[in-house]
Amino acid sequence: MAFNKEEKIKSLNRMQYEVTQNNGTEPPFQNEFWDHKEEGLYVDIVSGKPLFTSLDKFDSHCGWPSFTKPIEEEEVDEKLDTSHGMIRTEVRSKTADSHLGHVFNDGPGPSGLRYCINSAALRFIPKDKLKEEGYEACLHLFEK
């Protein structure tokens, strides 16, 4: 899936730009997907690359969407983040190099990980719209 990063960045709203391009964080419990339960795919708002599925989403009570794992580990980069007087692991999209959020080791099993991701860094594609939106190759992820 080809994309024009410069054009896509111009189309972002203020919060999406702040989060993805300036490593910002949106307010907890006041974002689009923190309590979203619909079945589907969460893709990078900039590149459109599939990052997470609803199957790996869980309620971590932190106010941001949380996932146990990405669809493909190769699509996310992890970097040391020492901002704000903390030591954390930042999660960035590999293709667009956009800030997504952070990963912590306090998630449920078997991974034990919690990918705490800003809604502003994501676009949701409902399962029944995957083919229509060009994500037919991801339908197998939802087969039981």
UniProtKB/Swiss-Prot annotation:
Keywords from UniProt, A to Z, are:
Oxidoreductase
- List GO molecular-function terms, semicolon-separated: peptide-methionine (R)-S-oxide reductase activity
Q: Cellular component GO terms, alphabetically?
A: cytoplasm
Family matches, as Pfam families:
SelR
* Top EC class of this enzyme: oxidoreductase
- List each copy of the MsrB domain by range: 5-127
Q: What EC identifiers does the entry list?
A: 1.8.4.12
- Which reactions are catalysed by this chain? L-methionyl-[protein] + [thioredoxin]-disulfide + H2O = L-methionyl-(R)-S-oxide-[protein] + [thioredoxin]-dithiol
| Entry-linked InterPro entries | Met_Sox_Rdtase_MsrB, Met_Sox_Rdtase_MsrB_dom, Mss4-like_sf
Supply one GO BP term.
response to oxidative stress
**Catalytic residues?**
C116
- Alphabetized PANTHER family for the sequence: METHIONINE SULFOXIDE REDUCTASE (PTHR10173), PEPTIDE METHIONINE SULFOXIDE REDUCTASE MSRA_MSRB (PTHR10173:SF59)
The record's family statement is: Belongs to the MsrB Met sulfoxide reductase family.
Query: Per its record, how is this protein called by name?
Result: Peptide methionine sulfoxide reductase MsrB
Q: Which organism is it from?
A: Bacillus velezensis (strain DSM 23117 / BGSC 10A6 / LMG 26770 / FZB42) (Bacillus amyloliquefaciens subsp. plantarum)
Gene encoding the protein: msrB
